[in-house]
Amino acid sequence: EFMNILKTTPKGWATDDILVPNIMESLDTTDGTDFVCTISVQGHGDYPTEPTLENPEINVTGVEDEGKRNAWEYYVNEVHEMDKFVGQLIDAIEQRGEPTVLVFYGDHLPTLGLEAKDLKGKYLYNTNYVIWDNIGLEKKDGNIAAYQIMAEVFDRLDIHTGTIFNYHQQRRQTKNYLA
């Protein structure tokens, strides 16, 4: 909320390199258990249809339309930078030696004119999520809505406080859950 943003993407979004030190600072402010919610914006669009990156690490091929190719190249390079952030965050967390669960998910796909037919899973509004931990949680695959993910993680951690979390944890598998 009060980060000193020094670096932005060519489209004006804050880059993720600012996040690791700020997350570590947040974790250092208390001696006890922490809950930190961080939102990355580096990969957000609109994605430029003109060449924007001087020396991209990843070159997109196979897209005939030059504007679309430029937009995809910009997007995949920003996601590549976001992947680096994830690796840096995990390294920093591992060095702390504290029991930790990290949840990574996207709340939407990129605004690149995608249609359901373009996607392997055919679901335009689904995104993947990854849970990383150093406490031995059992891997559990499945589909879950973004608004349910924290209730699911807290349930797996045996945390059952909070009205909304309790509702999602207790009612998710019932007939009238979202009625």
Task: Mark where each language-model region is.
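Solvent-exposed soluble domains appended to multi-pass membrane proteins
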Residues: 1-179
